[in-house]
Amino acid sequence: MQLVTAAEMQQIDSYTIETIGMPQNVLIERAAMSVIDVIGAGHFNLDHILVLAGLGNNGADGIAIARLLYTQGFNVSLQFVGNVSRAKASVQQQLQIIENYGLIRAEKSDFNEATLIVDAIFGVGLNNTLPEGLQKMIKAANHIEKTVIAVDIPTGIDATTGEVRGAALKAHTTVTFGYNKVGLTQNVGGYLSGNVIVKDIGLRLPEDFTFTTVTPDNIATT
């Protein structure tokens, strides 16, 4: 089974963008479209979709997902988690796009109103314990047991070890990109990730790349 750690996934991302020449915004769009495909193919209640987006590239994916849902006529709310001034350039670009589309960001969203939550707060780049405020928000979302689709990996899960970094959103489905992550098969990561679906978004492997060898038990590939 082809599995990668967080560092290996970042290596693959960098190689695809910097050496192959694939623009990052193309990867973001492909990632977003793959999540839209899963949402459309699943038996989810789509009456009110809440997208939670963070400061990094995972958040950029989430913003693009919200835009695609919005343009398809879905009732979607986008809540940005974190200080916008600290967001990556990819996030700033996606925020500018949604403003031009007329999608207004919600300052605060009520989890109780959402029928589906898309988790795009933190991806494989998470390497610290989540801030206390975010941990509190995650625990509140888990408490009301909403259906969650995680983008690449549930927020709070270490992509290499599967351990929880303070708190983690429990996902019904995780749409992960390129290759499955070791952390989605190990420790509590295998439980909290739910049904894992691997989507090809055009990532390419560096020469002589070697996959991490682990035997997962919850992987679904498409």
UniProtKB/Swiss-Prot annotation:
One of the GO biological process terms: deadenylation-independent decapping of nuclear-transcribed mRNA
Residues holding (6S)-NADPHX: 57-61, 123-129, 152
GO CC field: P-body
Needed co-factor(s): K(+)
Keyword line: Isomerase, Metal-binding, NAD, NADP, Nucleotide-binding, Potassium
Domain of life: Bacteria
Assigned EC number: 5.1.99.6
Catalysed reactions listed for this entry: (6R)-NADHX = (6S)-NADHX; (6R)-NADPHX = (6S)-NADPHX
Annotated positions binding K(+): 58, 119, 155
Residue intervals of the YjeF N-terminal domain: 9-209
Cofactor note: Binds 1 potassium ion per subunit.
GO MF annotations in UniProt: metal ion binding; mRNA binding; NAD(P)HX epimerase activity; nucleotide binding
InterPro entries, alphabetized: YjeF_N_dom, YjeF_N_dom_sf
Role, per record: Catalyzes the epimerization of the S- and R-forms of NAD(P)HX, a damaged form of NAD(P)H that is a result of enzymatic or heat-dependent hydration. This is a prerequisite for the S-specific NAD(P)H-hydrate dehydratase to allow the repair of both epimers of NAD(P)HX.
Family: Belongs to the NnrE/AIBP family.
PANTHER family membership: ENHANCER OF MRNA-DECAPPING PROTEIN 3 (PTHR13612:SF0)
NCBIfam families registered for this protein in UniProt: yjeF_nterm
Name listed for the protein in its UniProt record: NAD(P)H-hydrate epimerase
Gene coding for it: nnrE
